[in-house]
Amino acid sequence: MRINPTTSGSAVSTLEEKNLGRIAQIIGPVLDVVFPPGKMPNIYNALVVKGRDTVGQQINVICEVQQLLGNNRVRAVAMSATDGLTRGMEVLDTGAALSVPVGGATLGRIFNVLGEPVDNLGPVDTRTTSPIHRSAPAFIQLDTKLSIFETGIKVVDLLAPYRRGGKIGLFGGAGVGKTVLIMELINNIAKAHGGVSVFGGVGERTREGNDLYMEMKESGVINEKNIAESKVALVYGQMNEPPGARMRVGLTALTMAEYFRDVNEQDVLLFIDNIFRFVQAGSEVSALLGRMPSAVGYQPTLSTEMGSLQERITSTKEGSITSIQAVYVPADDLTDPAPATTFAHLDATTVLSRGLAAKGIYPAVDPLDSTSTMLQPRIVGEEHYETAQRVKQTLQRYKELQDIIAILGLDELSEEDRLTVARARKIERFLSQPFFVAEVFTGSPGKYVGLAETIRGFQLILSGELDGLPEQAFYLVGNIDEATAKAMNLEGEKK
């Protein structure tokens, strides 16, 4: 891994010796810059525009070269607002790609796409930096071991387990709980595994970014008293940023995660919320650069852009990056090119269902639509596999019977089917769980349920031992013992 040992002071002095160009055209966030003959910058080089606007305010805009147009002109995309820029302004070619701080100094801090801290906590140690554009690890460096990553969330661990060092997609429309699930995972992983996380906020709401930061400070994931003890680094490029920043902020977060994996040899969790916004920003940039759009108006380079990001997220013999990516599904259409391209890279999918959210079952993870390549007997063991398959069969049968129930009612079902429906409704409710990060909304304390406890609970429901308990006893509880205790309380209240 190439590390650039630069300090901010020396970076400026080396810039002075580089070649200068001038702005020839500005169209929103896209700049055309003319350079002297023979002094053209390379693709992905960072350009710096410095100067003053009409009211004398200092301007410092960093752009990234995207196209070489010929006639000594390059087209670059700005990483911040282009307000105040004028034609004829001087542009410096840095001679290298964007580099961002990496290592322990990033923990507990919030950065923008350029690796600049935006949390008003003072400067960050920039002695160790790394370029955001790097090639994926070679095949020979990759680690091929298969092991489960326990999350403490029942529905995930039982039916669609995550792979350590794998890529997981969180699919769902607006408002079904993707961000809450991500916050719970960060919380559980920091507490149960002591792992380092990097959170990339790509094109989402600034308010959510702020809420997440406050939540992390409250839960101790970010340690305010001793910032170096924190377990997460945050990189934000929010909805109000230009498309260039939203397109590159994922790479900034990934670069920080790669350092923890390759140099510190740690297991890292990389959260990207939302990978769809990465595609959306790429689509905006593609249109601004004048490329012909592809299906549904997306960029023609959609698969290439997605592949270059996803192939860097992998496990090597040094360490692993387990990535959890929220995927917004436009109009709940899973065949849209953005989610469809993302599917190709994933080891597991956690699909959130609006129907379950409407029933009040949280996390609203669809047990039949969510999948995992890890759910095989040779990986998870026979007991886990059998239990998961029986749970799915019971829920599938219930789904098939729902039309009959809606038209004819429960009484028209056979005795066996009525039993299946009763157990399926208990399973459906037992798949819900109180979250630590949602304690303020639900009023019930969060629960972390180990995999062995989860399997035991569902085996008891399937065996029929708990057929006599009311189904509401299984709603929003942790392990099965809590459900039986809740049933006794409900009985006591009736008397």
Swiss-Prot record:
Organism of provenance: Barnardia japonica (Chinese squill)
| EC assignment | 7.1.2.2
Compartments, as annotated in UniProt: Plastid, Chloroplast thylakoid membrane
Q: Which NCBIfam families match?
A: atpD
- Name of the gene this protein is made from: atpB
Q: What is this protein called?
A: ATP synthase subunit beta, chloroplastic
Q: Output one GO BP term.
A: proton motive force-driven mitochondrial ATP synthesis
The protein's job, in short, is: Produces ATP from ADP in the presence of a proton gradient across the membrane. The catalytic sites are hosted primarily by the beta subunits.
Q: What class of enzyme is it?
A: translocase
